[in-house]
């Protein structure tokens, strides 16, 4: 399964959104989006990249052939180059412009930053809900007397 992040802790505690966000599908589709952005920018700067090549790249962002990636990675021993090759198989007219002039860190590091940003935005939204719920709870029970504790002992009024 490539659409969910897998680990013992994640399967117990992570939300469906976070499992999908940190999945292989999201990571490698983000790589492909970055390659599309790179090709588009290079085209605008005058490199010999056609609009048809960019369009073909855009058409194949989500259809990742993981069997092809795995086979190619065993041959070249490089995850990014295995994905470049596989993307080129899906978009043959654009194969020569995928990753043009980029380093591996262009896709790996930037994809991580995009995923972390999205995760933090999600966490922020969830924290806002928690804070609102706690504020409502505190307001609702503000007049309720409670037993106080200090140093793990209940307070005794003398």
Predicted features, each with a name:
Residues 1-155:
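A helix-coil-helix interface module used to build multimeric assemblies
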